[in-house]
UniProtKB/Swiss-Prot annotation:
LRR repeats lie at residues 60-91, 153-180, 182-206, 235-260, 275-302, 327-352. This is Putative F-box/FBD/LRR-repeat protein At3g49480. Pfam families: F-box, FBD, LRR_At5g56370. The keyword Repeat applies. The keyword Repeat applies. Keywords: Leucine-rich repeat, Repeat. Residues 364-412 form the FBD domain. Residues 11-59 form the F-box domain. SMART domains: FBD (SM00579), FBOX (SM00256).
């Protein structure tokens, strides 16, 4: 009896797919793995070279084999895509200082048949992220980088020296992120920003442990819609405490996020279109507070540093949502002072980290008149970090009882609350006279509208 032997033949159904579909498949794997497909067959040899996104991210295995730097250099020589949607280079502290990844990028060429087309950074990158954490000195970007016509999003991080030539033009750049970079001099960032006529979003992070050669960071960008600025104590031995560290002239700004431990060094010019402000200034100035009068969304942290300057604003006439971080009990009365200036407030969020022990309760005087926002507009009230002290309970009770249009209320206990103490929260629910129920552990602490 003849035995029937079956032979299974693996059929390659992928290679017959069109190039566009193969490129989409390779985009689902790391760039290094995509490039390795060049050894599969002649059909695959050139497919990866058309990838519109390249990611070079150093890993532990790359460091041991020294492959990431070789791969970075070689792949730029062969890449042929007409346009790079994103180029991401992320090299860690193990990157040898005798290599220069910037030169590799500078030498990369666009893909005409002659292979001598214009530099990659001149013509065909939309989104560039370059992060360098090596142990060497900060390195300069190539001059061609400052003339890239297609660049729309840019992130420079850590050991990058921003040395801007006299003439510079980034006509398409809309988003810029400068993370702990070093600037050649005081004017380098000014020249860079002035070359971006359509810049919409600027994010700046300054490292307190690194001298970045800038005393006053100036942001003068008429087109800017959002500014994120983060910095710590950056005083130098020759620093004048009265000198501003941030000066902004952004008349069309809509959103301002500032995290700065030297808030009194801010100079914010007139911003009539400002909608959202998030800040954790330690020492805000009156000049900083005044432009906030037109905002719709406001987050103040810590609130105790803002109280002395609240008088600078008579009325937050457009404010719809307010989130504050509370750290002192004697500021409870100031909450109602703030509410009295927010006639259209719909959402009021309090994030409290006040300790419940070793404290003499402050005398809280109920205001003679109910803030207009409570009687007419407030819809959402949340208190996160409730500890059940008597003065805290009184002000929460006052807000709940006088908020005639309240739809939802959330109160979350402090993490140190015991089971017995949590029973006290039930008292708050019984105090509430409106149909709204108090959600005892659902404070979300986020803007709603």
């Amino acid at each position: 009896m003849t035995e029937l032997v079956e032979h299974r033949v693996c059929e390659d159904r992928i290679s017959s797919l069109p190039d566009d579909l193969l490129v989409k498949i390779l985009l689902c794997v790391p760039t290094k793995d995509a490039a390795a497909t060049t050894f599969l067959s002649k059909r695959w040899r050139f497919v990866w070279r058309m990838l519109p996104r390249l990611n070079y991210i150093e890993t532990t295995s790359d460091v041991k084999s020294n492959t990431v730097w070789w791969f970075l250099e070689e792949s730029f020589r062969f890449h042929k895509a007409p346009l790079l949607e994103r180029l991401w280079i992320d090299l860690g502290p193990q990157c040898p200082i005798n290599v220069n990844p910037v030169k590799w990028v500078a030498k990369a060429r666009a893909p005409p048949a002659s292979n001598v087309g214009p530099p990659l950074l001149d013509t065909r990158v939309r989104w560039l992220t370059f992060r360098l954490l090596w142990k060497g000195e900060p390195i300069r970007m190539p001059k061609s980088f400052y003339f890239c016509k297609t660049l729309e999003r840019l992130t420079l991080s850590d050991k990058i020296l921003v040395d801007v030539p006299c003439q510079v033009s980034l006509p398409s750049l809309r988003e810029l992120d400068l993370f702990c970079v070093v600037y050649k001099d005081e004017d380098s960032h000014v020249k860079l920003l002035s070359s971006c006529p359509v810049l919409k979003h600027l994010k700046v992070t300054r490292n307190r442990r690194v001298e970045d050669n800038v005393r006053t960071f100036r942001v003068e960008v008429p087109s800017l819609l959002r500014l994120d600025y983060k910095a710590g104590m950056m005083f130098r031995e020759d620093s004048d405490m009265s000198d501003p560290f941030l000066v902004t002239d952004t008349p069309n700004l809509l959103s301002l996020h500032i995290f700065d431990t030297v808030g009194y060094s801010l100079s914010v010019w007139y911003m009539p279109h400002l909608v959202t402000v998030v800040t954790d200034e330690l020492f805000p100035s009156e000049k900083f507070m005044r432009p906030l009068s037109s905002v719709k969304y406001l987050a103040l942290s810590p609130f105790d540093t803002m109280v002395p300057w609240c008088d600078a604003v008579n009325n937050y006439s457009r404010l719809v949502e307010c989130m504050i971080h509370l750290s002192e009990y004697d500021l409870l009365e100031s909450l109602l002072v703030l509410l009295s200036k927010c006639s259209k407030l719909k959402v009021f969020l309090v994030d409290s980290d006040i300790p419940r022990w070793n404290h003499d309760p402050a005398l809280w005087n109920q205001p003679s008149s109910i803030p207009r926002c409570l009687s007419s507009h407030l819809e959402i009230f949340e208190w996160d970090g409730y500890v059940g002290r008597e003065d805290e309970k009184k002000i929460i009770r006052y807000i709940l009882e006088n908020s005639k249009y309240l739809k939802t209320a959330g109160i979350s206990p402090n993490s140190t609350f015991s089971g017995e103490e949590k029973q006290k929260m039930e008292e708050l629910e019984s105090m509430h006279r409106t149909p709204t129920s108090v959600l005892l552990s659902s404070a979300r602490m986020s803007f709603r509208y």
